[in-house]
Amino acid sequence: GMGDSRIEVLKGIDLEIERGEFCVLLGPSGSGKSTLLNIIGGIDGADSGSITIDGERIEDMTEKKLSLYRRKHLGYIFQMYNLIPNLTVRENIEVGAYLSDKPLDVDELLHTLGIYEHQRKLPNQLSGGQQQRTAIGRAIVKNPDILLCDEPTGALDYNTGKSILKLLQNMCREKGMTVIIITHNQALAPMADRLIHIKNGQVARMESNENPTSIDEIEW
């Protein structure tokens, strides 16, 4: 029956990302970028192949270990901001901090994100951009080893988007965080240490960039 038809989203993807790199996965929508991010994040399983982080294969981890890996080592920024509706901006970010044994300073982060003066508001009292910044704060406050971002500036105006990317670039540089961003915005390519072009579920090509451009110098 129809139920058996399987669509292969990713085929023979082979890539390596170094610790502390700012990596951009570039490709049109529907090219399999989000699926790849979910597999790295341990949210989706791959039917075959393996993902190794720090020498450990994700598919060999027990449920308990996988959930610990996600909680302690991963930050995840989705296009949809799944904020907890009955918690304030500050409390939403503190939820992220509780999960970590090395969290960033919440006040400092609220300032950096430009939402310090909105910290007592509930999500439904915020603009889309403020909600997105709160969601980003919750992911970053954990001070994760790996930060996965799915079109992190998708819903943001140009300046807010730029300030968020600057924050992500700084986190990568200052904290040695591995940041993986998926986007269809070609303009972001020069800011990456590593640029991975994804096309029809495959790595079309991979480029390393010795001298990444600061986001300040990028226009789109």
Locate predicted features.
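ABC family nucleotide-binding domain
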Residues: 1-191, 197
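Conserved beta-strand-loop-alpha-helix hinge in the C-terminal portion
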Residues: 202-220
